[in-house]
Amino acid sequence: MALSRLMIRDFRNISVADLSLAADFNFLVGANGSGKTSVLEAIYTLGHGRAFRSLQSGRVIRHEQPEFVLHGRIEAGNVDARATSVGLSRNRLGDSTVRIDGSDGHKVAELAQLLPMQLITPEGFTLLNGGPKYRRAFMDWGCFHNEPAFFTAWSNLRRLLKQRNAALRQVSRYQQLRVWDQELIPLANRISEWRADYSAAIAADITATCAQFLPEFRLDFSFQRGWDKESDFGELLERQFERDRALTYTASGPHKADFRIRAEGVPVEDILSRGQLKLLMCALRLAQGEFLTHRNGRRCLYLIDDFASELDTGRRRLLAERLKATHAQVFVSAVSADQIRDIPDEKGKMFKVEQGKISLQSEV
């Protein structure tokens, strides 16, 4: 699975671009602020419905333009399969249109299913040293792509938690919350089971990849479901009613889950250098993408912003070798071509990005 064509209009500093892409490596080279990260962000937005550098859609629309428009052509990877066209537009009011094979009315979740991707950026350390929400997102990405019913259950869980938290400000007795909890409890248990199963299933892939990237450390991974593992969730909600009512939110549950990583028994953020943390982050993203391939035959797109950041030559070469071994489509940004010489790829393409204009510089 790969993007064979990408069209961008009025996204960030890019007025218009129409790119024919390589199925292997695509390199984006340009000075800081040139727009190379904007290309990565356009691809990410096409697959997620949102940008990774801003949660406000208006900020990614080019100055004085009413909307951005993104189009892509997805090749399935075999000769007999039909290509899929996808599109996303959004105006300054936040109204979106998702188009698949020429028809409107689709949901962003459908784009995410068609374009599984892994993002590695200089800000991606939050996966390791940020709050639990970043590691929940890591687990939920895997559940979303491996369990068809997950997204609906997850959406319903969010809705019920929001309603329950609003009700906590108004009720005086737990019995008044039962209408929400009767639906919430089975959803919470189901989502927790999916997360636990996924975390256990991917553990071997993560361990093997981390052993290549950080052989000097013994790493341990543990899933924490968000409430006491000895407690029944329904009983816990009733027991903690007064506490939740005082807080005006639900203090325990799958929305508090975490996926903890330790090195030699110590949280990785306390013992690893920034370069080692980046390698670990890359290992996690690669392991997750490869697990998807092993499980159902689908390949991710890998988006890597500022490839050389935090990595010496040896580590860049190791990352390049592992990326090539995935046989997936990879997009890499760098300030100069020197920073990506460790990624020789005879089938790749190199694009020069300058002030929002993108041109094919060479076939690698």
UniProtKB/Swiss-Prot annotation:
Single Gene Ontology BP term? DNA replication
**Subcellular location as annotated:** Cytoplasm
User: Which key words tag this protein in UniProt?
Assistant: ATP-binding, Cytoplasm, DNA damage, DNA repair, DNA replication, DNA-binding, Nucleotide-binding, SOS response
Q: In terms of domain of life, where is this protein from?
A: Bacteria
The GO molecular function terms of this record are: ATP binding; single-stranded DNA binding
Gene3D superfamilies for the chain: P-loop containing nucleotide triphosphate hydrolases (3.40.50.300), RecF/RecN/SMC, N-terminal domain (1.20.1050.90)
- Note the Pfam families from the entry: SMC_N (PF02463)
Main localisation, per the record? cytoplasm
Binding locations of ATP:
30-37
- According to its record, what are the GO cellular component terms? cytoplasm
Q: Does the keyword Calcium apply?
A: no
The record's SUPFAM superfamilies line, in alphabetical order, gives: P-loop containing nucleoside triphosphate hydrolases
Query: InterPro entries in the record, alphabetically?
Result: DNA-binding_RecF, DNA-binding_RecF_CS, P-loop_NTPase, RecF/RecN/SMC_N, RecF_2
Q: Which family does it belong to?
A: Belongs to the RecF family.
Q: What does this protein do?
A: The RecF protein is involved in DNA metabolism; it is required for DNA replication and normal SOS inducibility. RecF binds preferentially to single-stranded, linear DNA. It also seems to bind ATP.
By what name is this protein known? DNA replication and repair protein RecF
Species this protein is from = Sodalis glossinidius (strain morsitans)
Q: What is the lineage of its organism?
A: Bacteria, Pseudomonadati, Pseudomonadota, Gammaproteobacteria, Enterobacterales
